[in-house]
Amino acid sequence: SIETKTNIPFMDSISIKLNSKLSFENFVVGSSNQMPFAASKRMTQNQLSSYNPLYIHGNVGMGKTHLLNAIAIELKQKHPNLKTVFMSAERFMYQFIRAIRSKDTIKFKDQFRSLDVLIIDDIQFIGGKESTQEEFFYTFNDLINQGKQIIISSNKSPFELLDLDEKLKSRLGGGLVVDFLPTNFELRMNILNKKVNQIKLDIPY
């Protein structure tokens, strides 16, 4: 796994531990995922805030988390001084609830709003959770207004998330929205072959 180069306990404690295998190099590109891949790759090539937020959506197993992980890896390697956090929406909610219970919401707000890049996986998780949505909305606005980068993934486009507040949907859809198209047979076989080759490399002889 890849460790964060920025020694900030807050970031270390909430960020998903990056998987070095989920890199751009190991992502199998085809016609169905070319747009999400290109947008994600561009995000790391000195193109921060060229579109903000970047919102990637598609069905389960299409490679959304792989791309977010790959973005985080590239940013930490190319821009180690950026305060980058990659976390699930569930984890964001958990941190927010914990801050409320410990009467420490000011610290929570300050920590999240001091980030340079916030990467959130599965934003649909906060659907129907009004207080978490409201806090995320304010965090989102604050970061965008500062010119910081936000990258989001979901199983649906922002406008198809029924349990999400309308103003949050509007903000999520205000940047670049890219989706995964259904995979064809050729891409599925290429992905399978890639995984088989990785397994072979992992088996000691």
Regions found by a protein language model. Name each.
Residues 97-101, 156-174:
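Short regulatory helix/loop adjacent to the ATP-binding pocket of P-loop NTPases
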Residues 86-87, 119-121, 149-155:
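Structural recognition of the conserved hydrophobic beta-strand(s) that form the central parallel beta-sheet
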Residues 182-205:
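Conserved C-terminal "switch" segment of AAA+ ATPases
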Residues 76, 81-117, 127-130:
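Short glycine-rich substrate-engagement loop in P-loop NTPases that contacts/grips substrate
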Residues 14-54, 73:
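Pre-Walker A (pre-P-loop) alpha-helix and adjacent loop at the N terminus of AAA/AAA+ ATPase modules
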Residues 48-69:
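Walker A/P-loop nucleotide-binding motif
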Residues 128, 133-156, 166-171:
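Conserved catalytic/switch belt of AAA+ P-loop NTPases
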Residues 160-162, 175-187:
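Conserved AAA+ ATPase "SRH/arginine-finger" region at the nucleotide-binding site
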